[in-house]
Amino acid sequence: MIALLALSSPLAGSLAGQSQASPSGQISGVVSDQTGAAVQSATVIFSRGSFTATQVTDASGKFVFSGITAEAGVVRTSAAGFQTSDTDWRSGSGPLEIVLRPASAAEQVTVTANRTGVRLVENATSVVVLSGPDLDATAAFRLDDMLRQVPGFSLFRRTTSRTANPTTQGVSLRGLGASGASRALVLSDGFPLNDPFGGWVYWDRAPRESIQSVEVASGGASHLYGSDALGGVINIIRTPPDRNSVSLEAAYGNENSPDLSLSASRKMGPWSVGVASELFRSDGYIAVPESLRGAIDTLVNSQDATGDVTVRREFADRGDFFVRGSVFGESRHNGTPLQTNSTTIRELDFGGNWDAREFGAFQLRAYAGRQNLDQSFSSIASDRNSENLTRTQRVPAQQVGFSVQWQRTVGTRQHLVAGVEESNIHGQTNEQGYFNGLPTSTSAGGGREVNWGAYAEDIIRIAPDWLLTASGRVDHWLNFDAFAPPNPAVPVGAASLPDRSESFFSPRLAILHKLTSNISLTASGYRSFRAPTLNELYRGFRAGNVFTEANSNLRAERLTGAEGGAIATGWNQRLMLRGTYFWNQITRPVANVTLTTTPSLITRQRQNLGSTVSQGVEMELSGQVSNSITLSGGYEYTHATVTSFTVDPALAGLNPSLVGLNVPQIPRHQFDFQARYSRPFILLAVQGRFGGNQFDDDQNTLLLRRYFTLDATASHSLRPGVDVFVAVENLLNRRYDVARTPVLMVGPPILARAGLRLQFGAR
């Protein structure tokens, strides 16, 4: 709380009349709202230089400091739902009369994706926050589909995680170029969800009913989070098991799609236990358009189950400790009889938070997990009436890691953050080759990766209307015990590869200037990086008739970026508008580069391109039109192109220069909107999403056409805590392009479901 107050802006507050002088060495006063009502439990901090003292207002809004030897200082007052007030005080003045103004919705939202709580309107980073009500009002029931309402969010392909192969579920922000590996870090309560071997994300691991909110922070974040945060951070905040509560949602939809999500907790004194689980299955749909289908085209579908148990121990107001065990499993059919995959994950997490008073606050996170991915690939005849098994893979991986963070407020104008992290990953791919249905060769590739990082951040209010943030992080990573088959045709054996290491320094400087009580300007510059995953280094894959080779010589991607924008609030703080211009250059981006093309097979390899540049503008608008109607929307224009590329001389005729071409999978325009009508017993909401043209390949020959989709949901409360609802995704039933492999694949048809939601206790 003190850290939050130290960062809060002196937006409002007034000192009314000064009556008789307070006794020497004493500061007294009363805190009220604009109606004159007393504000109870407001936090009042007096500061002078490095000296600070804290009091809390009583039921009548009064506070008293005694034993004050300073002649002058600043009294900062804060309370939930109100703007923070700064009041100058001098010895001999009368009791203070402090009036607090209500905070806008944006001012009440605290963002934690930057490792410390900062109010949304005081954050120089572009952040979109989806609250619990926002998530409840979304027709989508997979987290990645919910996040598509955030401008700039995209996966490797447009396909939803309901049916997409998990290795295509890497996330991209701001047009940095999606691939199997994410270019943004996804966290759940501070623990990474990115796959340790491949960098993609299993979006179903966090049960939907256990999610309290989601923060999407765009822009390079390696200065705090290291390699995986090249383009930003997605922070999933789980509901803590700090009260007796039950939240259950059960639904059934077409495509034979049942879904059950549960979150429950029980508090017993300082101890509490939380349970969360989700079960889902769907028969899916045929992804190939009817005019192109053959005998082997079958349903793409999936089923998954996830569950976790959390045990938590609180220590009064000093902190807590918790342990969480989780399991996850899924299986998928990928559109033909022979193409399938399945995954199992088990993980154990530990965490603790401790307030050491004047020594600061400490946070610990540690985790260990193991997993296994099984997958099969086939070659498909040109008439799509037959297929042959070409390869099966088993990919085991293990990871362990920890992070320790310290933060402390210095006076009322400065906040310090520092921490260290380490992760250790071990993974390999074991492959069996087939020809004419018979096994022909075995091969293996993999290795170990260790990452170390240390970071520090200084957030300082250099003037009442200026907030400066300076941060930096040093990372060093090492790949060792690596091996790969010297040639896919070699029957058995693997060649050892030399150890490799790299280091990188990620600085960031950001500033926020409050022009008026309603308008702020922001600017920042940063560098970020992403080390190649074990998957990119050592595992190839096949999608349709496109085979992508691994490359053990890949080096880390490096990003240099800058952004500037403005935040404006108005209409009695019921309207917020945020606009940002961004520019990002990536040197050595890892891309799937086409090597050869034949009618039956396209061969690509992961390579470090020369460089790409992504620049554009993003806009976010939200408004509370009335007590019942909320409107919001976002738009992003992104111009992402290849700016340098070295052609392989041996393939110059087949592999022309890519300079000037668009980065694959990135549309030029994205737009979304949401409209919500809510009353005590009814909720109506619609969400629309538009995506412009984009290309599925590096040579810009496989076009995915623009699309628009509309979702809607309605719910009715039968009694407090008991709701019935209907939700429809793709209300217009438009089968838009999602991939070309090179055969066109289209997205899901309309999905309608109905269900029951039970909520007892606060979510």
PLM segments and residue spans:
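Short, acidic, small-residue-rich periplasmic hinge/interaction motif at the N-terminus
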Residues: S24, S32-A37, T43-V44, S78-F82, ...
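Face-selective signature of the C-terminal outer-membrane beta-barrel domain
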Residues: R312-F328, T344-V490, S496-L497, L512-K514, ...
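Gram-negative outer-membrane beta-barrel transporters
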Residues: L468, H476, R574, R578, ...
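Periplasmic-side early beta-strands and strand-to-turn transitions of outer-membrane beta-barrels
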Residues: S222-H223, N235, R243-A251, S263-T344
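Conserved C-terminal beta-signal and adjacent last beta-strands/turns
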Residues: E314, D458, A523, E557-A562, ...
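Short acidic/polar hinge/loop motifs at secondary-structure boundaries
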Residues: F191-S218
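Membrane-embedded beta-barrel scaffold of Gram-negative outer-membrane proteins
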Residues: F362-S379, L512-K514, S520-Y526, R530, ...
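Extracytoplasmic beta-strand/coil segments of soluble accessory domains associated
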Residues: V127, D144-D195, Q212
